[in-house]
């Protein structure tokens, strides 16, 4: 069975899918990724599907499942490298990638995750300011 490599870049895990996704490979990827998120404390997951010529309903569901698992573990998922034909196929199949943000490439995906984390920090700082003002 082939394994999909998971690379750590800063606070982000990069998954580059370069193999055909069998059921077994998908389940293994889900388990490996969940373990890596917990082990590293990363808050972002980028899934690069540039090498995939076809994304069928199985791969679409797998991406949604990975995003859900990542979200439960406090990591945001961004899918990058989607080709126009793949996007068209997903729409034609009626698949919505709930909970998954998309970006054109890895760099843009990293920017999305960084911006999202910055927004969370700003919101947390605002909450602290409100609590401090209320108790003063």
Task: Label every model-predicted segment.
Residues 5-8, 35-39:
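Short, conserved, surface-exposed binding loops centered on an aromatic residue
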Residues 115-136:
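Intrinsically disordered or compositionally simple regulatory linkers and C-terminal tails
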Residues 99-109:
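Short acidic-hydrophobic, aromatic-tinged amphipathic segments that line or gate anion-handling sites
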Residues 40-43, 47-96:
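Amphipathic alpha-helical interaction surfaces in cytosolic regulatory modules
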Residues 37, 66, 111-116:
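Catalytic cores of nucleotide-enabled group-transfer and carboxylate-activating enzymes in metabolic
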Residues 2-30:
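STAS-typified acidic loop motif
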Residues 27-31, 61, 111:
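Short, contiguous clusters of charged residues that form electrostatic/catalytic patches at enzyme active sites
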Residues 30-37, 44-46, 64, 131-133:
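Extended, hydrophobic alpha-helical segments
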């Amino acid at each position: 069975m082939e394994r999909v490599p998971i690379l750590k870049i800063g606070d982000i895990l990069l998954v580059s899918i370069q193999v055909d996704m069998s059921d077994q490979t998908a389940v293994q990827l889900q388990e490996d990724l969940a373990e890596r998120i917990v082990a590293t404390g990363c808050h972002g997951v980028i899934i690069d599907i540039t090498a995939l010529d076809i994304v069928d309903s199985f791969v679409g569901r797998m991406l949604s499942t990975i995003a859900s698992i990542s979200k439960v573990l406090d990591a945001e998922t961004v899918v990058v490298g989607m080709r126009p034909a793949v996007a068209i196929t997903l729409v034609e199949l009626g698949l919505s990638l709930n909970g998954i943000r998309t970006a054109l490439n890895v760099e843009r995906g990293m920017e999305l995750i960084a911006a999202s984390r910055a927004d969370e920090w700003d919101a947390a700082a605002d909450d602290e300011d409100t609590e401090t003002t209320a108790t003063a």
